[in-house]
Amino acid sequence: MKKTVLREYAKLIAKVGANVQKGQEVFIQAELDQPEFVAMVVDECYKLKAKKVVVDWSYQPLTKLHVRYRSLKTLSTLDNYEEARWQHYVDTIPCRIYLISEDPDGLRGVNQEKMARSQQAKYPIIKGYRDQIENKYQWCIAAVPGEKWAKKLFPELRASQAVEKLWEAILKTSRVTDDPIQAWEEHNKDLHDRCEYLNSLHIRELRYKSSNGTDFTVGMIPEAQFCGGGETSLQGIFFNPNIPTEECFISPMRGVAEGIVYATKPLSYQGQLIDGFWIRFHEGKAVEWHAEQNNELLTKLIEMDEGSRYLGECALVPFDSPINQTGFLFYNTLFDENACCHLALGMGFADTIRDFQNKSLGDCRKLGVNDSMIHEDFMIGSADLSIDAVCDGGKVVPIFRNGTWAF
């Protein structure tokens, strides 16, 4: 891929995605296989007058070794220097950039029970810090084609060809055009206009139906609103958290969901794929589920904590979205969640509550926003998915027909 094009992508991530501010610290998380592109992003952050840019490198084989050889006690311990870093985030409110490129199968064979228990043990400590910075900082997740990820999508190609083809797909769906910034301004306006219409309906519940067996109803929080595209932090800074994005999303009412949903794409979770699964909800809670592939891992996900059994997000994405039109299954949630409609288990978003700026996080949760240590999207969109909105007064308004917008 031409370096001039990659430079435009790096600029898009730093300026439009994270919207790095003068004097702000930046923390970047990336895989070891992307040093050249990471350097471009770091350069763009400094051009935006970042105070300091720190890169935290990760490597899946090392994660597997840590889980294999360290005791559960040491894996479950948050050392003083790790807590100090979280306190630093609270004190300085840096922006965060996540450059994802990992192998979808990179953690196959790892002890999932050990990983889950260590995460559960550390979460109560991390949560205290995370709650203090909720909605205060900018963040952006964007993708870079790792070789093993690319080969997963295109096994028939040589590694270099597979990487190039994945680059093309990432850049196209991320709107890296002749003028990416203008393209994103137009895209954000379209998503904003759709959210405005949805919010004008005063929706009480959404009803989903598809020929694959999905028959599901979920309740809305009266004070909630649909959001999409860019967001504004509590510091007043506009940013785009996901590159790419195609969704209009809302956090539903905790405890109000009935019926069954069938996943239409595999879920990449903890370096493994969960496929062919369905989940049944009663009184908002996942009460029954099954996966043809990695059912045990699906169970670990749903049983991670009390909140992981409940929904944190309902996202509306047309089945003919640019990502779905590529014809690829990306084996990556950032892309696959923006290919079609999805739900998310776990944590809801406080910023979907109207006037959240003047409410505490606790206030938002009392209104019905779910709390959990996880937030995992799974795709339920299909070519014949219908969604109806039941609005105040009982009026029924079609939202989706044949998998796409009905308005």
Identify what each model region corresponds to.
Residues 219, 289-290, 400:
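Short linear motifs in exposed loops
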Residues 1-258, 389, 395, 405-407:
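Active-site bordering "gate/hinge" segments
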